[in-house]
Amino acid sequence: RTGPYAAGGIPFADVYADYFTMLNERDGGIGGIMTKVPECETGYNTEKGVECYESTKGEGALVYQPLSTGITYQLIPKVTADGIPLHTMGYGRTSAANGKVFSHVFNYPANYWNGASVAINHLLETNGGDIKGKKVALVYHNSAYGKEPIRTLEELSAKHGYELSL
């Protein structure tokens, strides 16, 4: 609810909590078990997110939803060892889509690679299927997750003939 991504985190957290409140009130929980949505304020700080996980994992977690790629990267080995699901909706480690390797990480409905592909497909659609010679720029922050789409965009550049500007 605070930090650099508060503008997106606040409404998400509100709706997430409201959904589980609705399940409790309407359905008596999930399978008869009432749900709780404990929150930890991380300010998008990875260390605080890991501290939150460590302090709450023993409370019978159904799933963790950190809303932070940095926190997600640090939690992947922990949730795998602890057998707790991690939902990283639209962010997180893209390669975690391989469920044979990452058994407790679920990054649906999309990830950074999907997003890059969708953007290029949109450009193809709006340019008659041909973007050869066009310039596509990716503005990103200098972090592991900020760089996640680069390889996909490079591969698609080779396939479709556009110039990638980073």
Regions found by a protein language model. Give the residues of each.
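Generic structural signal for alpha-helix termini and adjacent loop/cap motifs
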Residues: 26, 56-59, 126
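Extracytoplasmic "Venus flytrap"
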Residues: 1-17, 41-46, 68, 139-148
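Structural motif
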Residues: 33-58, 116-118, 166
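Signal peptide-proximal N-terminal region
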Residues: 14-37, 129-131, 158-162
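Short intrinsically disordered, low-complexity coil segments enriched in acidic
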Residues: 1-8, 24, 36, 165
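Extracytoplasmic ligand/sensor domains, especially the bilobed periplasmic-binding protein
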Residues: 47, 61-165
